[in-house]
Curated annotation (Swiss-Prot):
Alphabetical list of Pfam families matching this protein: Globin
UniProt source species: Cebus albifrons (White-fronted capuchin)
Gene Ontology terms, MF aspect: haptoglobin binding; heme binding; hemoglobin alpha binding; metal ion binding; organic acid binding; oxygen binding; oxygen carrier activity; peroxidase activity
Gene Ontology annotations of biological process type: hydrogen peroxide catabolic process
UniProt keywords, alphabetically: Heme, Iron, Metal-binding, Oxygen transport, Phosphoprotein, Transport
Name of the featured protein: Hemoglobin subunit epsilon
Listed PROSITE patterns: GLOBIN
Domain Globin stretches: 3-147
Domain of life per record: Eukaryota
Modified residues (Phosphoserine): 14, 51
Gene3D superfamilies in UniProt: Globins (1.10.490.10)
Gene: HBE1
Length: 147
């Protein structure tokens, strides 16, 4: 279990409260699909993923990205109990979707890039460290069923 300090929790929640989940979610998932094209195989029903502009403009990518980031909001509400929070999603991604758990780590890293892009100077090294800790812990929780 990962322990978050009070300062880390403040760093995470203060930025999250300013986050446009719909915009950032679509951007994060879209960037994942562009930068790591092998991840596209999990989204074969999303239609045109043939180019970066097609991916970033794809309404299904945007909608699923919003869903992903919305569930990430659950992590922020339950930072002290991530394994339980993501137990069902871990099971779904492992047993039914067969997603390589490494992809969770990649998505977390993309999220950190999105945060840095959106928040600029507000995304200090301390804030980045807190977020990196969170996205790593979420990736571990999502990969839990694989072990």
């Amino acid at each position: 279990m990962v322990h978050f300090t009070a300062d880390e929790k403040v760093a995470i929640t203060s930025l999250w409260s300013k986050m446009n989940v719909e915009e950032a979610g679509g951007e994060a998932l879209g960037r994942l699909l562009v930068v790591y094209p092998w991840t596209q195989r999990f989204f074969d029903n999303f239609g045109n993923l043939s180019s970066p502009s097609a991916i970033l403009g794809n309404p299904k990518v945007k909608a699923h990205g919003k869903k992903v980031l919305t569930s990430f909001g659950d992590a922020i509400k339950n930072m002290d109990n991530l394994k339980t929070t993501f137990a069902k999603l871990s099971e779904l991604h492992c047993d039914k979707l067969h997603v390589d758990p490494e992809n969770f780590r990649l998505l977390g890293n993309v999220m950190v890039i999105i945060l840095a892009t959106h928040f600029g100077k507000e995304f200090t090294p301390e804030v980045q460290a807190a977020w990196q800790k969170l996205v790593s812990a979420v990736a571990i929780a999502l990969g839990h069923k694989y072990h």
